[in-house]
Structures are given as structure tokens and as C-alpha cells.
């Protein structure tokens, strides 16, 4: 079984990774880009050739379906997102979709049609890398995405969401999509994107919860002025204000300790030239924790601290909290089933939380959901150096296949 999956991965992963590959290494496959469209179209053809019924929904989520014989109206769904970050790796997201297809294809060959319908899903978007919106794919599955929230947004190059969508053959709906009611379970395989499994020599992670996270875009408004003729005491320097905010906040996060994490990931000073005091600086904040109350309290204090620093320095501040996701537990019964499977197969595993957000957190409050983690070499992800040992990749697909067998092929 491992040998089969290893060979299948060695053949299909480079193929799927060729769509959106950067010449200098890594991958860039942003929502509704030509690379994104080519990937979805080619994956659709490959799944159809293997005997699955394929279709796109209204926003570009791709499905490959194998109908059940006794409970065709009950769907066991598996997959992940197909988009990437800019210059990312070839495992985050897409390997979960690929693994679902490989697992279902093997199960079909070994056992024939399932009792319950099984579907592969390659979700349109999760990362928020092109447009300021996340989980567009999974939110649309449950009618949670409001078209008005994306109708007027643009990417960094000024391309509108609506136009990008049209260029790929899709039309923005006028209202939220009708939620799917037929999904009875969702299983997502994903790389850990951290170093816990590798550090402990373990090949499988059974995820019991996903951290909550808050993301901000903050804009500081001071005054641009001549760098040589403006004395230090007369400046309204937004980069200096940012540096104070960053240092103070990171030190507080360090004192708080795990599992809290805080990141200032994007900084844009203006006018961004050597001889002008920066009068405007925009930056992002990403904060995560497994406890909703701790996350809320820490970020509220962070907002208060930022305002206090800006008041002291006569700097205007605009704080936009554009993502607020609470921690999400996985389904206890599915976690128990997956844990029992790992024990039965004598897998080297651990039960753990996810420090990253995943599509599973959109599914979990609505349908029974679980996640399987596989190790990330050196804990690296969102990076061209993102890697997982081929044996661990195959072990992950095997574990997924066994889980899907229990959910869809057994009563």
C-alpha cells in the first residue's frame, strides 16, 4: 500500500506542481489567475479520466465524485485548497486535494463503489494571498460568503475580484450560494507547517483543534518632511511609531509564551525614499491562540497600546480588523476514530492542535470534521523550501485512505 502511494505521488505531484511553478523555484498560484485556472482544468481532466464525475460550482470549487450504492445522498468529502501564497511551496493545500484523489482512486480499485458517496474537492481559495478575503472556497460551500464583501475589492495591481473571476469563466453571484446539506463528513489531509511532528520523530498528527486568529491592517498617518531639515523632536515619523509598536508588542507576546504567536508580516512606509521622513506607514498584524478569550484580550490590549503610542507621538491611526476567527474544535467522534485507526495500524502519531488556519475550520461547526497532519521538514512552509519526506507523504495518503474506507465503504 505504501509502495503504491509512494509511486503515485512521485508521478502526480510533480505534474500538478508544474502549473504555477516559478522559474526561480517555488509556486505562485493565486485565485482566478491563469495559473489557477490551468491547474483546476488539468486536475479536472485527470480526475475525469480516472472515472470520477467532475464539476465546478459557481465560484470555481472543483469536485470529483464517486457515487455510493446504498447511501448516495450522503457525501464523505475530502480535499483542500488549490491556491498558494506568492512564491510558496508545492504541498500546502494542493497535496490535500491530490491525496484525496489518490486515496479514493485506490479505494475504488480495491473495493469498487462505496456505500456512501465520496468526493474530492479542490477548493478555489483559502490563503487570502491575492485579494483581502480568506476561505472564499469553503465559505461558498456553506453559503457563508457574501458577494457584496468582494464586489469592489482589488488585488495589489488594481485588478478587481469581479473581473478576475470573469476572466476564468465564473460570474460573481448576486446572493450567497445555497448551502450544501449532503455532506456527512469532511477529512482534510495537510502538511503540519511546523516542526512538532518532525522534532518528535512522528509521521501522523491527529488534529483536535485549530487556533483562532485575528488579522489587522493598520495605517499610521504622520507628516512627510525633509530628512535633513526636520529636527528629531519635530518629526511625526510613522516608521518610528511602527517600530515602537512592533517592539513592545513582540516582547509582550514572548512573555505570554506558547501557544500565542504574533507576526508583523507586511510593512509599507510612504514615500519610502531615503531622504524623506515617512509620513504614512501601513502594516499587518497576525495573532493566533487556541483560547478565544486569551486571543481577544491580548489583541484588545494590543489595540490600546498602539493608540497610546500614536497619541504620544501625535500620529493618526486607523485599525482595520479584517479577520476574526475563533478557535475551532474537530469532531470528537472522528478524532477518536482516527486515533483508533492510528493505534490499530501501529502508526507513530500524536494528537495536536493546528497553529495555522485551514478550510477544516469552516467545515467543523457545520459537519463532522477531522484533520490529518504529516510532517514538514524543518517546519518550513509558505516557502519554496517546503518539503515532506516521500515516505511521510505516502503514510499520510494511506491514513487518509483507511479513514475514508471506514466512513464511506463501511456501514
Predicted regions and their residues:
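Midchain, well-structured core segments that form catalytic/ion-binding scaffolds
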Residues: 125-126, 130-292
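A short beta-alpha structural unit
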Residues: 29-32, 263-272, 284-290, 316-335, ...
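N-terminal capping segment at the start of a domain
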Residues: 2-33, 124, 382
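Alpha-helical metal-binding/catalytic segments enriched in His/Glu/Asp
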Residues: 78, 88-127, 214-220, 226-252, ...
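Active-site metal-coordination/substrate-binding segment of hydrolases
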Residues: 44-48, 53, 63-164, 395
